[in-house]
């Protein structure tokens, strides 16, 4: 179920403040965040984030296509090793 339109997108307040500071400063500092639930806004395009996945920080550079998605979508929390192979089929 998606968020109702009248509420608008959710973004943590401190994240907006940090993004504003990064935009105004000349150097492109990386914004470290634990806020996976925050929606990516158009003013975040071009900024570099480090999103926590529960274990480490994953670097995410925001592009136009990411607007409207959540930051957590681009920092997977689970490692996929592939399906378990059948041992009988391997021996032959």
From Swiss-Prot:
InterPro entries: Ribosomal_uS19 (IPR002222), Ribosomal_uS19_bac-type (IPR005732), Ribosomal_uS19_CS (IPR020934), Ribosomal_uS19_SF (IPR023575)
GO terms for MF: rRNA binding; structural constituent of ribosome
Pfam families recorded: Ribosomal_S19 (PF00203)
Record GO biological process: ribosomal small subunit assembly; translation
Keywords of the record: Ribonucleoprotein, Ribosomal protein, RNA-binding, rRNA-binding
PROSITE patterns listed in its UniProt record: RIBOSOMAL_S19 (PS00323)
HAMAP family, sorted: Ribosomal_uS19 (MF_00531)
NCBIfam families noted in UniProt: rpsS_bact (TIGR01050)
Biological role: Protein S19 forms a complex with S13 that binds strongly to the 16S ribosomal RNA.
Protein name as annotated: Small ribosomal subunit protein uS19
Naturally occurring in which organism (per UniProt): Hyphomonas neptunium (strain ATCC 15444)
Classification lineage: Bacteria, Pseudomonadati, Pseudomonadota, Alphaproteobacteria, Hyphomonadales
UniProt gene name: rpsS
């Amino acid at each position: 179920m998606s968020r109702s339109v009248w509420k608008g997108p959710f973004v943590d307040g401190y994240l907006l403040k940090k993004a504003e500071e990064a935009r105004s400063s000349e150097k492109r500092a990386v914004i470290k965040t634990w806020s996976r639930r925050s929606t990516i806004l158009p003013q975040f395009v071009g900024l570099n984030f480090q999103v926590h996945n529960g274990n480490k920080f994953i670097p995410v550079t925001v592009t136009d296509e990411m607007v409207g998605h959540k930051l957590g979508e681009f920092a997977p929390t689970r490692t996929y090793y592939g399906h378990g192979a059948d041992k009988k089929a391997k021996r032959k």
